[in-house]
UniProtKB/Swiss-Prot annotation:
Sequence positions bearing N-acetylaspartate: D2
InterPro entries: Actin, Actin/actin-like_CS, Actin_CS, ATPase_NBD
CDD domains: ASKHA_NBD_actin (cd10224)
Keyword RNA-binding: no
Name of the protein in question: Actin, cytoplasmic
Main location: cytoplasm
């Protein structure tokens, strides 16, 4: 690869797409992973109507569009719409020619083989990529924290995973997936705010609730104690101004919402909480490496951004683990983007330059090359 051409790094999440250039310390473009199509033809007079909208534009015109999320639970399920998102990323957001820049894409842990091949095929055949690579999201987050061994709890908008990693390689037999993430938290907050007498139902109002969640929610260290504090005083109450000027007050909802990460039964789910899932993941690993995993538990993704989450994880995992075990939860301040940052670091390493799948290798071997070169 030419050294003077910047590699592109694109992290496709269920909720947001993060894109930018290797070597940068943050993504240049962050936009919702949505594609919208007009519900009725010819509604918008004189708008020069397009047949589809992507990202922020789809979000702002959502009143007249049908919105689709091509990435569900971290996995691409709709390739036509995914192609639109990639096209938008290259041409509208980054404004580069994809045929000139090597590209690092990210994938969910346990991404099906056929999916990795399809991604590879689209990049080489539709976008004429000169070189590309597919990396596992959680592994990149671990790199971003300066480690090669540890366990990552990666929780985004659509899915959470616990991924044990040893010497840079994810251990597939011990990866656990939890379909409990940011979107569920937002829905749950909508539900409990409705119980307080505030009605939030439309997709537009859901965005408001997401904002309330991001600004005001936190994880309680001791849920029962926090509930009694909230019942006996108004010290935990905060107010929030809605776009129409109405002010609402929110109290115990602030910590009841993210509590569902630790008690999924709140959402009517039977799964284990994030703390227990992390512990179960560690227990599926070889006994000799567990110590390293307990001492290097890294939080990653937007849903781990709640204040108080690291202390609570520390408390819960300490209760589950052997009593002499040293437990350390690492919560980097930039963890919302740590997958992307890890990709930026990886793609700019000199030692990584021989790892790219080149167009020539793809032409010789076909899409299955991805399993041999990206692992």
């Amino acid at each position: 690869m030419d050294d003077d051409v910047a590699a592109l790094v694109v992290d496709n999440g269920s909720g947001m797409c993060k894109a930018g250039f290797a070597g940068d310390d943050a993504p240049r473009a962050v936009f919702p992973s949505i594609v919208g199509r007009p519900r009725h033809q010819g509604v918008m007079v004189g708008m020069g109507q397009k047949d589809s909208y992507v990202g922020d534009e789809a979000q702002s015109k959502r009143g007249i569009l049908t919105l689709k999320y091509p990435v569900e639970h971290g996995i691409v399920t709709n390739w036509d719409d995914m192609e639109k998102i990639w096209h938008h990323t290259f041409y509208n957001e980054l404004r580069i020619a994809p045929e000139e820049n090597p590209l690092l894409l990210t994938e969910a842990p346990l991404n099906p083989k056929a999916n990795r091949e399809k991604m590879t095929q689209i990049m080489f055949e539709t976008f004429n990529s000169p070189a590309m690579y597919v990396a596992i999201q959680a592994v990149l987050s671990l790199y971003a924290s300066g480690r090669t061994t540890g366990i990552v709890l990666d929780s985004g908008d659509g899915v959470s995973h616990t991924v044990p990693i040893y010497e840079g390689y994810a251990l597939p037999h011990a990866i656990l997936r939890l379909d409990l993430a940011g979107r569920d938290q937002t829905d749950y907050l909508m539900k409990i705010l409705t119980e307080r007498g505030y009605s939030f139902t439309t997709t537009a109002e859901r965005e408001i609730v997401r904002d309330i969640k991001e600004k005001l929610c936190y994880v309680a260290l001791d849920f029962e104690q926090e509930m009694s504090t909230a019942a006996s005083s108004s010290s935990l109450e905060k107010s929030y101004e809605l776009p129409d000027g109405q002010v609402i007050t929110i109290g115990n909802e602030r910590f009841r919402c993210p509590e569902s990460l630790f008690q999924p039964s709140f959402l009517g789910m039977e799964s284990t909480g994030v703390h227990e899932t992390t512990y179960n993941s560690i227990m599926k690993c070889d006994i000799d490496i567990r110590k390293d995993l307990y001492a290097n538990t890294v939080l990653s993704g937007g849903t781990t951004m709640f204040p108080g989450i690291a202390d609570r994880m520390q408390k819960e995992i300490t209760a589950l683990a052997p009593s002499t075990m040293k437990i350390k939860i690492i919560a980097p301040p930039e963890r919302k983007y740590s997958v992307w940052i890890g990709g930026s670091i990886l793609a700019s390493l000199s030692t990584f330059q021989q790892m790219w799948i080149s167009k020539q290798e793809y032409d010789e071997s076909g899409p299955s090359i991805v399993h041999r070169k990206c692992f």
